Amino acid sequence: MIEFRNVTKTYDTGTKAVKNANFLIEKGEFCFLVGTSGSGKSTLIKLILKEEEPTSGNIIINGKDTTFLKPNRVPYLRRSMGVVFQDFRLLPDKTVYDNVAYAMYIVRATQRHIRRQVPMVLSLVGLSQKAKMYPHELSGGEQQRVALARALVNNPSMLIAD
């Protein structure tokens, strides 16, 4: 599902965020990546999402080498992933419902499917009663659950949390 083959990421400053990473995460596996602050955990996620390019090595996602993936194909790669970012990346001027629905709008889901799916995932994360609230009205834990609901709403093949 996710494979790194001799992946190195060196930033323009000369900082090596990732050095010769080799690993394979197969379908159905649950993987934790732990390390100190600045050890490259977020960089690995950015590499998986193609927000960053490796300096060397190959990254294989769902059996496809992303090394030569054209920029216009990156959104399709990302659709197979649900991502909860460290900073949640919620839209401050949108309700909880709309923050979750936004992930479905992007993939052009029908309004009918959105109306059915969003309440279901909000219930799953215990936020049904908060659907009309805005991010600033929620606790940090509730904001995190909105981000989780948004990551799950399109039934991704993998869930990545930073």
Locate predicted features:
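Conserved ABC ATPase signature
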Residues: Y134-L138, E142
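Catalytic Walker B motif of ABC-type/P-loop ATPase nucleotide-binding domains
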Residues: L159-D162
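Helix-to-loop junction immediately C-terminal to a conserved catalytic motif
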Residues: L49
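Short helical segment in ABC ATPase nucleotide-binding domains corresponding to the A-loop/adjacent helical element
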Residues: Y97-Y105, R115, P119
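Conserved ABC transporter NBD signature motif
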Residues: G57-D65
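Hydrophobic anchor residue at the start of the ABC signature
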Residues: L148
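A short, proline-enriched helix->beta-strand linker immediately N-terminal to the Walker B motif
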Residues: V153-S157
